[in-house]
Amino acid sequence: MSEGESKSTHFGYKTVEADKKAELVAGVFHSVAAKYDIMNDVMSFGIHRFWKRHTIEVSGARPGMKVLDLAGGTGDLTAKFSHLVGDKGEVVLADINDSMLKVGRTKLRDKGIVNNVSYVQANAEALPFPDNHFDIITIAFGLRNVTDKDAALRSMNRVLKPGGKLLVLEFSKPQHEIMRKVYDLYSFKVLPKMGELITKDADSYEYLAESIRMHPDQDTLKQMMVDAGFEQVDYTNMTDGIVALHRGYKF
């Protein structure tokens, strides 16, 4: 790359300047924030609740722990963690998108979840937290939207305590051909129509489908976590690999 030439990355299937992607992704989530929870239930037939519940179970969160729910959006995981860590624990819901943070804050406060939760607008690539600060970090359905995923994983490793655990819940690659065909049909034909009907925004859900296809597969993400300094990295496929939960530790 010549001096002064801009780096590029992908926004769905489009190639864009790397420094423009965050703004484009922000536009997607500003658009869908108000109907985000409804769309999650509709487009996953409610199965996202099972995926998130499994993530909570695997986390091993206990009273007194500090948890970072990164790209935490509307707060589904934060709500569960708040109960698990108790009054002596702390949960930070961090998201780069202020519209999502506002929805999450309002939802959790309406549920009476206020005492041990704080909200931070933050870029995953440069987390504004001290070194060795959190016992658990989760990032659910957020990593694929990050421009520099390697930088984000290194940043997560930095703020995780020794002995701490990172959980990455993300759309991935179906394991069987018939599921891949059904999933492609659903993603590219049905999902945008749902988005248009419910949020009046088909384009954002076209981006969703494309961003999933451009995201690293299970083994590639596993190696990226290893390269970022995580150890004992493994993953569990759910729903035939439509979603994978990656787990890594910092020692």
Curated annotation (Swiss-Prot):
It comes from Shewanella sp. (strain W3-18-1). Keywords: Menaquinone biosynthesis, Methyltransferase, S-adenosyl-L-methionine, Transferase, Ubiquinone biosynthesis. Belongs to the class I-like SAM-binding methyltransferase superfamily. MenG/UbiE family. Its EC number is 2.1.1.163, 2.1.1.201. The keyword Plastid does not apply. This is Ubiquinone/menaquinone biosynthesis C-methyltransferase UbiE. It comes from the Bacteria. Pathway: Quinol/quinone metabolism; menaquinone biosynthesis; menaquinol from 1,4-dihydroxy-2-naphthoate: step 2/2; Cofactor biosynthesis; ubiquinone biosynthesis. Methyltransferase required for the conversion of demethylmenaquinol (DMKH2) to menaquinol (MKH2) and the conversion of 2-polyprenyl-6-methoxy-1,4-benzoquinol (DDMQH2) to 2-polyprenyl-3-methyl-6-methoxy-1,4-benzoquinol (DMQH2). NCBIfam families: MenG_MenH_UbiE (TIGR01934), PRK00216.1-1 (NF001240), PRK00216.1-3 (NF001242), PRK00216.1-5 (NF001244). S-adenosyl-L-methionine binds at residues 74, 95, 123-124. It catalyses: a 2-demethylmenaquinol + S-adenosyl-L-methionine = a menaquinol + S-adenosyl-L-homocysteine + H(+); a 2-methoxy-6-(all-trans-polyprenyl)benzene-1,4-diol + S-adenosyl-L-methionine = a 5-methoxy-2-methyl-3-(all-trans-polyprenyl)benzene-1,4-diol + S-adenosyl-L-homocysteine + H(+). It is an enzyme of class 2 (transferase). GO terms for molecular function: 2-methoxy-6-polyprenyl-1,4-benzoquinol methyltransferase activity; demethylmenaquinone methyltransferase activity. CDD domains: AdoMet_MTases (cd02440). The keyword Plastid does not apply. GO terms for biological process: aerobic respiration; menaquinone biosynthetic process; methylation. HAMAP family: MenG_UbiE_methyltr.
